[in-house]
Amino acid sequence: FGSNPGGMLTRAVRKGDRYVLNGEKMWITNGSLADVCVVWAKTEDGVIRGFLVEKGTKGLKAWDLHGKWSLRASVTSGLAMTDCEIPAENILPKAEGLKGPLGCLTQARYGIGWGGVGAAMACYDTALQYAKTRTQFNNRPIASHQLVQDKLVWMITEISKGQLLALHVGRLKDRGRADFSQISMLKMNNVWMALETARKARDVLGANGIVDDYCIMRHMNNLESVYTYEGTHDIHRLIIGERITGIPAYF
């Protein structure tokens, strides 16, 4: 349900030893490929619970979304459940309320923080090598130009800061001390950093930056999606804002 998961419309109604699910989900990774789906739905008392729905269950329909300019190597699907009956034992026993799905998001956001570093490094390395070998104006490498060096320095500085942030949060996580707002900061900062790095790297390569001989446009297109999924950039700013002020500003 976008940035308002608490407003989800999918419902699960108890029927004897079974639950009946009705609703739709969009933008589900590998939804049409998965043998088992984890579906979050509101029960009759309005509490969000998690359910395991197996592929082939009557009433479950999955379809793929096409025409994407981003995440083209990933299968993205929609799911629809129409009077979809599953055994009551398929409920996740310890997942109750928003804590369940948001806990999953927190884990994913941590991984994305590192993924942003990897994408940024690929773009930086490409731009650096290109700048050192591409020559112009009396056969000089464009890396000798002040403005090109400025872009390269910006990239490696921001990447290094992102690496340190990811390492710090990772160490806190290993000790069980990582706060969800710190993980929001990691995801927010490192995806922004990676997207800006991709844009600057594309600029260094000029027209060559848009062709598939180089990885930059692929990373840039994918990062446009990562900027939004697992919590939008702006939502993460609000999460951090509430943490430091104690005042929620979502509405």
Question: What residue spans do the PLM features occupy?
Answer:
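A gly/ser-rich beta-alpha-beta helix-loop segment of oxidoreductase catalytic cores
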Residues: 1-14
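Short Gly/Pro-enriched turn/cap motifs at secondary-structure boundaries
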Residues: 1-3, 27-30, 42, 68-75
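Short, solvent-exposed loop/turn segments at the edges of secondary structure
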Residues: 5-7, 33-34, 46, 74-76, ...
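Short beta-strand-to-turn element immediately C-terminal to the catalytic PLP-Schiff-base lysine
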Residues: 13, 39-42, 52-54, 80-82, ...
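Alpha-helical interface subdomain recognition
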Residues: 14-19, 80, 104-251
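A short core secondary-structure module
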Residues: 18, 22-63
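Flexible, small-/acidic-enriched active-site or ligand-binding loops
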Residues: 56-85
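A short, charged helix-loop
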Residues: 77-103
